[in-house]
């Protein structure tokens, strides 16, 4: 059997959905299968390009809900990530749990001199055309706080 001996590289950067925020908790019934409705607890983070995509890392940062100032104490939570086959995510068989990122409790203020440490999941994953990645939170962030999920990758 002949193998592909020529490495392939992504053609176009794909940084996922801009301003992907999760701030409230998913319902217990949806928290393990990725079937939540898209909203403040569950958000689309990435869509693969027409020829598929490669993802290098997923980062979770402390942020604020749109139009708000980041100030207060974040609750500790887990951000769960699901790979969806491009079909309706509210059908459990269309989703696969991709990974989890633990985010510790953190007090933030907008003009603080303290650096908030992002949580990074190095993943190196090739995904088929049209597949999506969704992110959801297991615990509400609190107040006007939210976690921003960003994905670094590219389209083939």
Question: Which residue ranges define each predicted feature?
Answer:
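Buried hydrophobic-core signal for structured, non-transmembrane domains
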Residues: 58-61, 133-135
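Extended extracellular/luminal ectodomain segments enriched in beta-structured repeat modules
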Residues: 49-57
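C-terminal interaction-tip segments
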Residues: 1-38, 47-50, 88, 126-156
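Short amphipathic, basic-aromatic surface patches that mediate peripheral association
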Residues: 60-70
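Aromatic- and Gly/Pro-enriched, solvent-exposed loop/edge beta-strand patches characteristic
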Residues: 91-150
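Beta-strand elements of well-folded, non-transmembrane domains
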Residues: 62-64, 85, 153-155
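Short, surface-exposed beta-strand/strand-loop-strand elements in extracellular ectodomains
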Residues: 68-90
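Short beta-strand/loop motifs in extracellular/secreted proteins, especially
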Residues: 56, 77-79, 143-147
